[in-house]
Amino acid sequence: MASEFKKKLFWRAVVAEFLAMTLFVFISIGSALGFKYPVGNNQTAVQDNVKVSLAFGLSIATLAQSVGHISGAHLNPAVTLGLLLSCQISIFRALMYIIAQCVGAIVATAILSGITSSLPGNSLGRNDLADGVNSGQGLGIEIIGTLQLVLCVLATTDRRRRDLGGSAPLAIGLSVALGHLLAIDYTGCGINPARSFGSAVITHNFSNHWIFWVGPFIGGALAVLIYDFILAPRSSDFTDRVKVWTSGQVEEYDLDADDINSRVEMKPK
């Protein structure tokens, strides 16, 4: 922890998470204003769902490309938790990232509140359960939506892979859009605790808010379990890997594989 605390690059990464999260929330929630969440019996029109989903997905893809080389562009506490459990970042980095993400979301939502105060029924994108959706169902939707997102992040950023092509930020952005297409009509789609937290703070309404922390965190943890221990298990000892939690982020890796079909292993230099 001490080694990261003293590095300018670390604090630049924290600032990058804050700035990118501020832009993400402003752009994405700004696109959704005018649509009242949670939706009622008369659900939002398909074209509205697509517009909002694309805004969330494209903003993540754009900002991931912009700051990915600085902070990794987590922009989501569930993603940060997933990478922590995957032993790719330290506990200190995860904590500072989550704080930066939450503060960025609050700042962005506060700015939006001032700009859009005249909009009728302005919920500032606050997440809540739709009519007829109970807390268990909403929790399940948030778990599944976040699971597929964090699974995509782990797979598209896996440095052991030699078959990766295309754009990882675009793939992750599409995963975010997919999650929204699934969840908008049920929960307004959280799958990002910081984004949900910003709206709850500014509107002073924390109704069912726990769902939008517990669901994404469970989904993120399940994604790590599935990817790191079932789909693409790592051969290195787990007790060695968890040293990253206190020593700092792993930045360089040795790739050990005979061919593209062999299982490869990530080993910190």
Curated annotation (Swiss-Prot):
GO terms for biological process, alphabetical: ammonium transmembrane transport; camera-type eye morphogenesis; carbon dioxide transmembrane transport; carbon dioxide transport; cell volume homeostasis; cellular homeostasis; cellular hyperosmotic response; cellular response to cAMP
InterPro entries to which the protein is assigned, alphabetical: Aquaporin-like, Aquaporin_1, Aquaporin_transptr, MIP, MIP_CS
Cytoplasmic compartment segments: 1-11, 66-68, 83-90, 154-163, 225-269
Glycan attachment sites: 42, 205
Subcellular location(s) per record: Cell membrane
Transmembrane segments: 12-29, 47-65, 91-109, 134-153, 164-181, 207-224
Start-end of intramembrane regions: 69-82, 187-199
Motif NPA 2, residue range(s) on this chain: 192-194
Function as written in the Swiss-Prot or TrEMBL entry: Forms a water channel that facilitates the transport of water across cell membranes, playing a crucial role in water homeostasis in various tissues. Could also be permeable to small solutes including hydrogen peroxide, glycerol and gases such as amonnia (NH3), nitric oxide (NO) and carbon dioxide (CO2). Recruited to the ankyrin-1 complex, a multiprotein complex of the erythrocyte membrane, it could be part of a CO2 metabolon, linking facilitated diffusion of CO2 across the membrane, anion exchange of Cl(-)/HCO3(-) and interconversion of dissolved CO2 and carbonic acid in the cytosol.
The protein's name: Aquaporin-1
Organism: Pongo abelii
Gene: AQP1
